Amino acid sequence: MNLPLKFNYNYSECMVMKLGLAIPDKEHKNKSKVLMTFDEALDYIKKINNITQGITKIYYLVGWQYLGHDDKYPDFFEVNKALKRKEDKTAYDSFKWLSDEAKKYHSVISVHINFNDAYDNAPSFDDFVKSGALIRKKNGKPNPIEKYNGRKCYKTCHKGYYESGLFKRQFDRFADTFPFIAESGTIHVDNFQCYKNYAPYVSIKEMQNARRKMIEYVKSKGIDITSEFTYKESNTLANKPIFGLPRDHFKSSPMDTVGLIPMSWWCYRMTDKELLETSPKIYCQGTFREKTLNNIFYGNMHGEDIVKKDNPDWINDFIYAFATYQVPGHYLNSLKRVAIKGRVNNKFCEFSDGVVSYAKGRKITKNGKIIKDGDTLFLPFVHEKSTYIAYSKNGDCRDWSVFEDDKTMADVYKITENGNEFVRKIPINNNKLHINLPEKIGYKIILK
């Protein structure tokens, strides 16, 4: 496939997640409800780095701006003051501090922003109205399609936004204000769907063309865009969800941003043909909305659903998700998808190297031998040579096949948030490794 853009990261082998920092406080006007400070974020980042064995991680911070998540879009120029560290003069300084410190832990700090939503409390809102950069009803009035944080949420008209020069002005200001984020080479743009405009009429296709120009402009600054969805809009797609149902894209419509957006948080409505022809290095998923595909291909765990101050067991939950979802996702992403067969729950995918992944039972085999059996696994850790991750949710004891003929011994390490702990050496006999796995403990195993 001839790619229009070259990405800064191979997202198919990174760990990409959000961290929720703050939301507007609905009970106290002009206040922010802090979920996690910059200081606390770094503490999580250190522990996650140990759990994930130092692989490259990209964190998109949610609620870093103004009063928190979804506040004052389409502006994104001020750091949330409630997140400031005591020892810093400004919240901006604290944000920059976190970005610098995270690099020590193989972690990239960036932001979760939005090019679609517009609220009337944004300083630039009047400019959007005057520039024709908002979706309008047939009567010419801006159309508040959704509602968040108790405020009407208007949508930007991508064509008007781009052609008016307003998009370039907004993004230039963002990149100039936060050079350390621009240097990260990646941002997450939430809900980047296209909507029809009715005054003047602008079709979905025209909006898609403008969206491509917006993505290309961001890339001209050296920055990749990841986003929320797989974008497969058609002109028959309604602007507003009907009867409260999700605004869903059609499976029959082509993927519009392949080669432009390398990763989506929610991947869905892809055909089997698209799944086979689109390499994860070009486009990969956080998770699939379709359970069957999620059980076959795995993906990038939504760590932000786990890493919360009100979750006292987040470490065990994180190790579980990393071992049973992230590790198999990275492993399968390293292989070529050859064929998808079966139907519904009996669906499976054949990969290169003799690997088959089954939806039923969430099993993975190599040359007919089990390497993942539901929540029990002994899988290659593709980031390090001759290294495996072993885990069992309910405990397990069995022989696992070793496919490397020259290995005679295995060093076993327990994975913890404070670093790996050496456990023991285990001999490899006749390409078999006998391991007793206590429940809910992750192990890193290095073959010698």
Language-model-detected regions and their locations in the chain:
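Extended acidic/polar, glycine-enriched regions
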Residues: 1-8
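Aromatic- and glycine-enriched glycan-recognition loops and surfaces
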Residues: 23-129, 208-212
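Active-site-proximal substrate-binding groove within the catalytic cores of carbohydrate-active enzymes
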Residues: 1, 15-39, 115-118, 122, ...
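Non-catalytic protein-protein interaction scaffold segments in large eukaryotic complex-forming proteins
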Residues: 10-12
